[in-house]
Amino acid sequence: MKSRSRSAAVLVAAISIALGASACSGGDKTGEGDGKGSAAANAAVTGVVNASDKKGGTLVYEASDTPDSFDPGNTYYGFVFNFSRLYARPLTTFAPAPGAEGNKVVPDLAESLGVPSDGGATWTYKLRKGVKYSDGTEVTSKDVKYGVERSNFARDVHSNGPSYLAQYLKDNEPKYEGPYKDKSDEGLKSIETPDDHTIVFKLKQPFAEFDYLLANPQSAPVPKAKDDGADYVKHIISSGSYMFESYEQDKQAVLVRNPNWDAGNDPLRKQLPDKIVVKLKVNQETIDSNLKAGNSHIDIVGNGVAQQTQSELLSSKDPNTDNAQGGRLVYMAINTKVAPFDKVECRKAVQYAVDKVSVQTAFGGPVRGAVASTVLPTDIPGHVDFDTYKTPENKGDEAKSKELLTACGQPNGFETTITARNDRAGEVDMATAIQASLKKVGITVKIQQYPAGKYFSDYAGVPKFTEDNKIGLMMMQWGADWPTGFGFLQQVVHGDAIGKTGNTNLSQLNNPEINKMLNDNIANTDPAAREKVYGDIDKKVMDEAVIVPLTYFKVLHYRSPKITNAVSNPAWSGQYDYLNVGLK
């Protein structure tokens, strides 16, 4: 893979030019262009660019790797959460809008948001009537129940995706083993379907943000008769506006209009392109070139352009760019189950050793995010500004790090391994900068790269693999599952979130006090009161030194002037909202 790094001097100069320009432009709040892509830089952050209902054409996405899965019940990449809504309608979703409006949860397959009862421990939803799959059969509440069962209670088959519903729904006695092992018609008793258009969820405790939780694709319907486990991804049946025409693993997916989709029971979707093509495993520089040449339209992964492209765009003051934030943190997880990181002093030594400015520069400089010191990003409600491991100018403190290495019984340092995703050059560059920082205090780091599509299912997200291979450090980016402190923190710091595969609590943190604070807080119906507690949880996590915050992620997109309805949605980590993108 080609290196995407440029010298720090060239990059910083380009960033300085761009920041000066963007301070003058202010963006296009109306989102209106002249039809030739003349909207200002950041126009899609503050508005909708080229709003249009024009139909037709083939919309082309490209990705630098294969996703973990297009199966809505077996994915945990944000871009698939975003994209899957085209063919899998969850009960709720986020409004396709910029700014604060984009963080609002709205009904999708459900007629309205949920009706809580039993103090918030029971939630009832009514499904829209007349919603049909691509084969013409009608969607029922039993299909939604089955979708939840297969995605949350069959982790040996579907290892990816959040585990909230498995954690918080009341379990059967004896324990429910999922639909592939439990062949009973009743299934999970805590999900009731009194009729074809009503579904009731019964939880172990009150859960104030349940509407947000159901915005993930695990609440999309899957008819039991059509499911064949791991092979379902090969012939997904659509409940959305588009359906799969073909899917070739590691090559491409092609979607066409679902002829049975009805705008009358779907107020969110427009069904604009004739066809949608997703090309997989395309080199990032090639993606950037294709976007600029008009040969493709969107980088579906949404991690931003390569550094060389970034420098060119910023130096030329290209207006077809969006520099967006979206509740996301770039960090390094420290594995508490791999020695010597089972000792908190050794973890703290790493915290002090890292030169975060060098890491930030390796990732692309300030335009890609400010240096971070907390787990909660600055745009998540409940964020509190603090720095537990403050160092001079954020460039590390070698003396303090060596002092802590001595305290943890490693005065001469030690060897460990750090993982990064091999299709993400910026992530590898950051790992390289960390490697250099740790070398200064005697910690020798080997960088091990793995494919993004298998990063959680086979490698970094498999505790046994990380322990067997003595992987002590793991590069990670995390965007909130929904824009609250709980939606950000729970799956990365709660002990119950640790899984055998598809694990996202990479540090394997299991602190009873932190677990209890999260559980107790989500039961509180007062949002302001919940927000206050999340800052306290953040501080306790940082005291454990299991996460090294690196940058508060910002993305630099190239916005194709050929697309319509371009809007950067913070709910999708600043990605363009894929629900209604069309072509001029």
Feature locations, PLM:
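Ligand-site clamp/hinge motif
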Residues: 226-236, 261-312, 444
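Structural transition elements
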Residues: 242, 367-407, 422-429
